[in-house]
Amino acid sequence: MLLIPAIDLKDGQCVRLKQGDMDQATVFSEDPAAMARHWVEQGARRLHLVDLNGAFVGKPRNEAAIKSIIAEVGDEIPVQLGGGIRDLNTIERWLDDGLSYVIIGTAAVKNPGFLKDACSAFGGHIIVGLDAKDGKVATDGWSKLTGHEVADLARKYEDYGVEAIIYTDIGRDGMLQGINIDATVKLAQSMSIPVIASGGLSNLADIDNLCAVEGEGVEGVICGRAIYSGDLNFADAQARADKLRDGQ
């Protein structure tokens, strides 16, 4: 089970939101690169970056902070980024700058042809982010709810060559209420693309529950507010996941 610390960027700072609300941002660090280094020292094997400003305006907005993170740890572990990535030039630029994966969210929903082109041009580097509330996909920084069912949309991407799908339960994001295991497993079982869970991770019990369904196609989890608030120690969580993987 891949545990992936999240670094959400707003106005150049590392923040956490509640349920995607930009007005409910808690600043955890004014030095994102130092935060990235901290998570690597705690045993992180990948980092998940979100350009929050970019997600709302549709183009990159926290370039300096993102590049500082890549410079700090990009040679050691893979770094993935979502938020404001809606054209091929932006993808190419970020990959050239040292990102390992780019996450396409809104653009994948609104323009499947773009996603197909991105997978064709940058195979192995494209992850889709599907954010949902009550099973329905949301776009534009979670500000707009569509009529698309998550599983129906995800299955359409199977032939594209998508590396993984990050499934976020918006209602649980930042609320420390636990991962929506049932919905995550249901999505993973409905298709062949690996799923990364997101939204609500709160304690070691969540890690146990996720590891129990790893064989169903759930390959990782985004670690957000819990590892910043102290509710979950990241190093302990990674150690627990490794023990469960090894059957200990």
Curated annotation (Swiss-Prot):
<dbReference type="InterPro" id="IPR023016">
    <property type="entry name" value="Isoase_HisA-like_bact"/>
</dbReference>
<keyword id="KW-0963">Cytoplasm</keyword>
<dbReference type="Pfam" id="PF00977">
    <property type="entry name" value="His_biosynth"/>
</dbReference>
<dbReference type="GO" id="GO:0000162">
    <property type="term" value="P:L-tryptophan biosynthetic process"/>
</dbReference>
<dbReference type="InterPro" id="IPR013785">
    <property type="entry name" value="Aldolase_TIM"/>
</dbReference>
<dbReference type="InterPro" id="IPR044524">
    <property type="entry name" value="Isoase_HisA-like"/>
</dbReference>
<protein>
    <recommendedName>
        <fullName>1-(5-phosphoribosyl)-5-[(5-phosphoribosylamino)methylideneamino] imidazole-4-carboxamide isomerase</fullName>
        <ecNumber>5.3.1.16</ecNumber>
    </recommendedName>
</protein>
<dbReference type="GO" id="GO:0005737">
    <property type="term" value="C:cytoplasm"/>
</dbReference>
<feature type="active site" description="Proton donor">
    <location>
        <position position="131"/>
    </location>
</feature>
<feature type="active site" description="Proton acceptor">
    <location>
        <position position="8"/>
    </location>
</feature>
<comment type="similarity">
    <text>Belongs to the HisA/HisF family.</text>
</comment>
<dbReference type="InterPro" id="IPR011060">
    <property type="entry name" value="RibuloseP-bd_barrel"/>
</dbReference>
<comment type="pathway">
    <text>Amino-acid biosynthesis; L-histidine biosynthesis; L-histidine from 5-phospho-alpha-D-ribose 1-diphosphate: step 4/9.</text>
</comment>
<keyword id="KW-0413">Isomerase</keyword>
<dbReference type="InterPro" id="IPR006063">
    <property type="entry name" value="HisA_bact_arch"/>
</dbReference>
<dbReference type="GO" id="GO:0000105">
    <property type="term" value="P:L-histidine biosynthetic process"/>
</dbReference>
<dbReference type="GO" id="GO:0003949">
    <property type="term" value="F:1-(5-phosphoribosyl)-5-[(5-phosphoribosylamino)methylideneamino]imidazole-4-carboxamide isomerase activity"/>
</dbReference>
<keyword id="KW-0028">Amino-acid biosynthesis</keyword>
<dbReference type="InterPro" id="IPR006062">
    <property type="entry name" value="His_biosynth"/>
</dbReference>
<keyword id="KW-0368">Histidine biosynthesis</keyword>
